[in-house]
């Protein structure tokens, strides 16, 4: 029987052809996350393994996914564009087309997910990037931030306050935990038993916490520093299913309920519990942006 197309967005034929083709534009990005005021610099190459030479101007566009709060939707807006003159990309070669330099200092007023699209003739490619506001995180006065559940945390909770609990993301801080992973395990824990079994994150993308940290329900490159931190194994006394803000998915061999970020009521107050160790990830634009958000 002939195989039927898979009913998923990632399996659409046009998405596969976008990277698996004879001619393709390649952008050598140093990273995927930036802060406003930075300059995106990247070498551009043309991979031409088709039957004909490729020639023409190379065009690029930076598209931003801007929130439309009135319609509760997102619109894709071109915020920057330009072109580079390319004389020729001979067949059978990988040719350097030039260097992109894009100033990320205007027309973007909030933290946004963007797509950088590059095109020459019929060859098109697109790369996701994230641009964050260049602001230092500041804990609101109404929130008690702590790395220990100390007497002050108990007092705040007893009085109906909010506690943000964020220890160092290491095994000594979370005894009943595993190291989380950005990707799934290799093959299976049954075949390679030294793996801890983490299978990536499931994210409540519409949670208010992510208003200034655009995300999908799964991890993308902006999650790399956070996704590889600890994930706590929830005790049996926690009613399942538990609706964590960030759930760490477990291997089929264990099926342990795990989380990296969740909120709950403790006594009269509210507790935001994090295993991400964001205070130690402030060298990353994405780490700073998530803590600020």
Where would I find each of the regions flagged by the language model?
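Short alpha-beta junction capping motif
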Residues: 141-188, 268, 274
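Beta-strand-rich interaction surfaces with strong enrichment in secreted/lumenal proteins
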Residues: 30-32, 83-90, 104-105
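Hydrophobic beta-strand core residues of beta-sandwich domains
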Residues: 34, 88-94, 108, 157
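Extended substrate-binding grooves/exosites of carbohydrate-active enzymes
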Residues: 1-39, 45, 67
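Beta-strand-rich binding/interaction modules
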Residues: 39-86, 96-103, 110-120
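Short amphipathic C-terminal alpha-helix that caps PH/PH-like domains
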Residues: 287-293
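Catalytic beta-strand/loop cores that center a nucleophilic Ser/Cys/Thr
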Residues: 171-173, 187-285
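Short beta-strand elements
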Residues: 83-88, 122-140
């Amino acid at each position: 029987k002939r195989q039927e197309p898979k009913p998923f967005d990632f399996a659409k034929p046009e998405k596969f052809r976008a990277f698996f083709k004879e001619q393709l534009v390649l952008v050598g990005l140093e990273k995927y996350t930036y802060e406003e005021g930075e300059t995106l610099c990247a070498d551009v190459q043309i991979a031409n393994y088709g039957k004909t030479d490729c020639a023409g101007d190379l065009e690029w566009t930076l598209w931003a996914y801007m929130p439309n709060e009135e319609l509760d939707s997102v619109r894709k807006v071109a915020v920057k564009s330009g072109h580079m003159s390319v004389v020729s990309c001979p067949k059978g070669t990988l040719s350097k087309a030039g260097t992109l330099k894009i100033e990320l200092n205007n027309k973007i007023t909030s933290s946004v997910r963007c797509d950088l699209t590059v095109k020459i003739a019929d060859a098109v490619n697109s790369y996701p990037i994230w641009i964050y506001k260049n602001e230092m995180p500041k804990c609101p006065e109404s929130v008690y931030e702590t790395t220990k559940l100390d007497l002050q945390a108990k007092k705040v909770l007893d009085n109906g306050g909010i506690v943000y609990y964020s220890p160092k993301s290491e095994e000594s801080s979370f005894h009943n935990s595993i190291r989380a992973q950005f990707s799934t395990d290799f093959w299976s824990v049954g075949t390679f038993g030294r793996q801890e079994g983490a299978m990536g994150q499931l994210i409540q993308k519409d949670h208010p916490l992510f208003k200034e940290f655009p995300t999908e329900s799964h991890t993308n490159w902006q999650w790399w520093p956070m996704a590889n931190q600890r994930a706590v194994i929830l005790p049996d006394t926690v009613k399942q299913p538990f609706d964590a803000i960030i759930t760490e998915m477990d291997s089929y061999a264990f099926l342990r309920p795990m989380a990296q970020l969740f909120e709950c009521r403790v006594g009269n107050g509210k507790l935001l519990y994090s295993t991400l160790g964001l205070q130690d990830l402030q060298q990353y634009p994405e780490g700073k942006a998530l803590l600020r958000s």
